[in-house]
């Protein structure tokens, strides 16, 4: 390095290539001038004055210097005060050169795949070892040896996976312990495969697999079917319910039990729909006939007003079942009707919650002479 004097202003030809961003002292510009040649573009390139100049060729990217030994940074460029065009990771990137990874031989892709954890469970590894044995049985040490020889991944941390092998042998029902014969030298029992557990490995494919739905549901299919049948029988209607419906449709509904009177009425009964529409028209005052018809024994108060006072549709509850086939005589024979065109026997078929508000004994609908 030649001696030089520190000028007050920095050289003008270095400022375009190496702009100062306020992080390095002004003296660094002079170092850039003496040790780095200006380039046509400010893109990061390896300077040609390092390590003898002509020994290395110029490369477009300093992160791809993988053709030579590692370089040491010059003493005048510490890592904390690196220039803007040399990033902070420049010194760290050189630690990952192939020369530093010489202990890792990768001759082929197959060798690389042996260093990856195999996609087999410990139970599958045990099954593979036992299945490949001549006598279809192995000792614990022989299973260890098979796993270590065929899968180099398990050469490290042997204590961990060997403990898992022992747990799988003792807890998995697919592995059976066979005592050693008296004339067989050595120690330790043999382990063999249960013939009933062949399905867990998919016909020789020892990869991890999900449990089949057919296998999981076969053991509980009969129990589930019995529960379903019992539930359907419990939710089905009793055979005596139609008889109860016929009983509730008889005229002596007032003497029937409360359970029978609480049965819901079918919504599609035409007689009931006609009756409700007529009653609604009567209460709202849209029926012109109801205003002019008078009933003997009533006061001078209009009928529509009395109907509004006596009828309370807000407290209306579902009516009992009305059967149009059980009482055909009442509907077929002509009877005397009241102002709404219905006989008194018709109102006896509804629940007491409804006709408690309708006096069927002489206020609106007299019953004298209406019974057949």
UniProtKB/Swiss-Prot annotation:
**GO molecular function list:** DNA-binding transcription activator activity, RNA polymerase II-specific; RNA polymerase II cis-regulatory region sequence-specific DNA binding; sequence-specific DNA binding; transcription cis-regulatory region binding
User: Which species expresses this protein natively?
Assistant: Mus musculus
Q: Which positions make up the DNA-binding region?
A: 117-211
In UniProt terms, what function does this protein have? Transcriptional activator required for the development of normal hearing, sense of balance and kidney function. Required for the expression of SLC26A4/PDS, JAG1 and COCH in a subset of epithelial cells and the development of the endolymphatic system in the inner ear. Also required for the expression of SLC4A1/AE1, SLC4A9/AE4, ATP6V1B1 and the differentiation of intercalated cells in the epithelium of distal renal tubules.
Q: In which tissues is it expressed?
A: Expressed in intercalated cells of the epithelium of the distal renal tubule.
Q: Which GO terms describe its biological process?
A: inner ear morphogenesis; positive regulation of DNA-templated transcription; positive regulation of transcription by RNA polymerase II
Q: What is this protein called?
A: Forkhead box protein I1
Q: Which InterPro entries match?
A: Fork_head_dom, FOX_domain-containing, TF_fork_head_CS_1, TF_fork_head_CS_2, WH-like_DNA-bd_sf, WH_DNA-bd_sf
Q: Where does the record place Low complexity bias? A: 216-225, 247-257
Source species taxonomy = Eukaryota, Metazoa, Chordata, Craniata, Vertebrata
The record's Pfam families line, in alphabetical order, gives:
Forkhead
């Amino acid at each position: 390095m030649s001696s030089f004097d520190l000028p007050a202003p920095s050289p003008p030809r270095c400022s375009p290539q190496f702009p100062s961003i306020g992080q390095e002292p002004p003296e660094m510009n002079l170092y850039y001038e003496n040790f780095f040649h200006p380039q046509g573009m400010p893109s990061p390139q390896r300077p040609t004055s390092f390590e003898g100049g002509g020994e290395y060729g110029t490369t477009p990217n300093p992160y791809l210097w993988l053709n030579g030994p590692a370089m040491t940074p010059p003493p005048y460029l510490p890592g904390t005060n690196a220039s803007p065009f040399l990033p902070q990771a420049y010194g760290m990137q050189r630690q990952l050169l192939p020369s530093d990874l010489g202990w890792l031989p990768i001759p082929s892709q197959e060798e690389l795949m042996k260093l990856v954890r195999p996609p087999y469970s410990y139970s599958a590894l045990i099954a593979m070892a036992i299945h490949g044995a001549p006598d279809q049985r192995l000792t614990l040490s022989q299973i260890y040896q098979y796993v270590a020889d065929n899968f180099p991944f398990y050469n490290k941390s042997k204590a961990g996976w060997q403990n898992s092998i022992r747990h799988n042998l003792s807890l998995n029902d697919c592995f059976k312990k066979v005592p050693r014969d008296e004339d067989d030298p050595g120690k330790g029992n043999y382990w063999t495969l249960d013939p009933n557990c062949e399905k867990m490995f998919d016909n020789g494919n020892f990869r991890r697999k999900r449990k089949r739905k057919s296998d999981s549901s076969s053991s509980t299919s009969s129990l589930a079917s019995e529960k379903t049948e019992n539930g359907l029988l419990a939710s089905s209607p009793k055979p005596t319910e139609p008889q109860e419906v016929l009983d509730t449709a008889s005229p002596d509904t007032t003497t029937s039990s409360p359970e029978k009177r609480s049965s819901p009425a079918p919504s599609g009964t035409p007689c009931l729909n006609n009756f409700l529409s007529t009653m609604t028209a009567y209460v709202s005052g849209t029926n012109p006939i109801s205003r002019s018809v008078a009933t003997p024994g009533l006061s001078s108060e209009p009928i529509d007003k009395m109907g509004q006072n006596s009828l309370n549709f807000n407290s209306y509850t579902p009516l009992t079942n009305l059967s149009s086939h059980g009482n055909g005589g009442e509907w077929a024979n002509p009877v005397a009707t009241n102002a709404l065109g219905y006989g008194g026997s018709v109102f006896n078929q509804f629940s007491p919650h409804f006709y408690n508000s309708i006096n069927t004994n002489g206020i609106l609908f007299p019953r004298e002479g209406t019974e057949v």
